């Protein structure tokens, strides 16, 4: 039988050495599922609540024993007896049990751990891969990866404001080849950094965190690495993306983007209009295909102006702006702000709500990018979600650190399992951009 008989959570560590949750779900048949919960460093103001203990004498206040107790003593009692295949009913039951708009009572981390474990247990019961269980028979698209090879902002100690400099192998024929291209550029970049006497230590997401002279220096160095690895920059090869994480350096009182927060005294201070001009300047100068959080999460006028200026040429991804929430996404669609949503399961807290956000985005002609968090685990669920939803894009870090590679390796397995059915769309993943042949 597929009936849930036990739910158990424990406290484990994430890739930063901070506590997080691992949840296990058991059924009468012996089918079993386990889910682990990621955590972000730069978090959106409107994200669902990640419940922490606040006890400074233990893990600096970051313990998750309250969330663990909520799973073991509250959620377990509520969902034991459910059919493990009834994902939506279980997720809705947990949302109702919490009763708050931001999951602040039980904790989104507690709810998400259960949601993932339930899905994995259902797949185990049906003896099918997780991506097949979640996506059905039409599952076939391997995502084009966003590879974060330079870390800045809140993800490193490097004096550069933009949080991520990414490469996307849009011209590769398969996911396996895309991964190889990215790995070779990553190693070429390491060699170039060493030759310049720059640091090759890696940040939270596995990218390098050197002391560049500025944003342009970072981009120019990546372009050299692409060439050194034997590839070309552009639509037939490898393109570049940014996660500006602009909310991290936006000064709401002064209404300016203050780069000096990360770059020191020489950092620019830009108004919203100047921020848009600067991003357009970068797009005109370099082969940039995607920009995430180019404006502050509450700067709706700025987002609309940025979209009007660049929305036909560049993917403009809302992360902190949308926080995987259909209410914010619906407003963005209505006001024509952004043209893509970043999907982070722990921003919203259940797989059901995650899938609803992806579906809403697609129906509106927005792209959806399935994403990791800076604090990750060996859990590879997001790889399965990316394929299950045919999202077409995934953002899961650089080509180092096992917590990042776990997702890439799972995608390699899935591509093998799908065989001739597997599709890698590359540049066609950006189906809502003029430059991609719409």
UniProtKB/Swiss-Prot annotation:
It is found in: Cytoplasm; Secreted; Cell surface. One of its GO terms (biological process) is glycolytic process. Its main location: cytoplasm. Its cofactor is Mg(2+). It catalyses: (2R)-2-phosphoglycerate = phosphoenolpyruvate + H2O. (2R)-2-phosphoglycerate binds at residues 163, 344, 373-374, 395. GO terms for cellular component: cell surface; extracellular region; peptidoglycan-based cell wall; phosphopyruvate hydratase complex. Pathway: Carbohydrate degradation; glycolysis; pyruvate from D-glyceraldehyde 3-phosphate: step 4/5. GO terms for molecular function: magnesium ion binding; phosphopyruvate hydratase activity. It is an enzyme of class 4 (lyase). Binds a second Mg(2+) ion via substrate during catalysis. Mg(2+) binds at residues 243, 292, 319. The active site is at residues 205, 344. InterPro entries: Enolase, Enolase-like_C_sf, Enolase-like_N, Enolase_C, Enolase_CS, Enolase_N. The keyword RNA-binding does not apply. Keywords: Cytoplasm, Glycolysis, Lyase, Magnesium, Metal-binding, Secreted. SUPFAM superfamilies: Enolase C-terminal domain-like, Enolase N-terminal domain-like. Its EC number is 4.2.1.11. Disulfide bonds: none annotated. Belongs to the enolase family. NCBIfam families: eno. Catalyzes the reversible conversion of 2-phosphoglycerate (2-PG) into phosphoenolpyruvate (PEP). It is essential for the degradation of carbohydrates via glycolysis. This is Enolase. It comes from Streptococcus agalactiae. The gene is eno.
């Amino acid at each position: 039988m597929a009936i849930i008989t036990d739910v158990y959570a424990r406290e484990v560590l994430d890739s930063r050495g901070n506590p997080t949750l691992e949840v296990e779900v058991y059924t009468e048949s012996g089918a079993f599922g386990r889910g682990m919960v990621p955590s972000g460093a730069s978090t959106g103001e409107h994200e669902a609540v990640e419940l922490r203990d606040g006890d400074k004498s233990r893990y600096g206040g970051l313990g998750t024993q309250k969330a663990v107790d909520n799973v073991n003593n509250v959620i377990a009692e509520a969902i034991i007896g459910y059919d493990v295949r009834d994902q939506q009913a279980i997720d809705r039951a947990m949302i109702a049990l919490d009763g708050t708009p931001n999951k602040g009572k039980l904790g989104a981390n507690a709810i998400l751990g259960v949601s993932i474990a339930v899905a994995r247990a259902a797949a185990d019961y049906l003896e099918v891969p997780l991506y097949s269980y979640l996506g059905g028979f039409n599952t076939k698209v391997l995502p084009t990866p966003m590879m974060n090879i330079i870390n800045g902002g809140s993800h490193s100690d490097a004096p550069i404001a933009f949080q991520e400099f990414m490469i996307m192998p849009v011209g590769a024929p398969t996911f396996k080849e895309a991964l190889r291209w990215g790995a070779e550029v990553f190693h070429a970049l390491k060699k170039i950094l060493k030759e310049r006497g720059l640091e090759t230590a890696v940040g939270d997401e596995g990218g390098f965190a050197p002391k560049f002279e500025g944003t342009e220096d970072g981009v120019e160095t990546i372009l050299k690495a692409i060439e050194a690895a034997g590839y070309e920059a552009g639509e037939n090869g490898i393109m570049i993306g940014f996660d500006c994480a602009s909310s991290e350096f936006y000064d709401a009182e002064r209404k300016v983007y203050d780069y000096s927060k990360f770059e020191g005294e020489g950092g620019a201070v830009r108004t919203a209009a100047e921020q848009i001009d600067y991003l357009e300047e970068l797009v005109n100068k370099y082969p940039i295909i995607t920009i995430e959080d180019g404006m502050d999460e509450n700067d709706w006028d700025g987002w609309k102006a940025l979209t009007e200026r660049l929305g036909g040429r560049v993917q403009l991804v809302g992360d902190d702006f949308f926080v995987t929430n259909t209410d914010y996404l619906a407003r963005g669609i209505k006001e024509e702000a952004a043209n893509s949503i970043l999907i982070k399961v722990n921003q919203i807290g259940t797989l059901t709500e995650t899938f609803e956000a992806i579906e809403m985005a697609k129906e509106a002609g927005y792209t959806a990018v399935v994403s990791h968090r800076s604090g990750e685990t060996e859990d590879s669920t997001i790889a399965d979600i990316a394929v299950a939803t045919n999202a077409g894009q995934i953002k899961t870090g650089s080509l180092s650190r096992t917590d990042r590679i776990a997702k890439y390796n799972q995608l390699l397995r899935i591509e093998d399992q799908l065989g001739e059915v597997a599709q890698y769309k590359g540049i066609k993943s950006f189906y809502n951009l003029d430059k991609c042949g719409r």
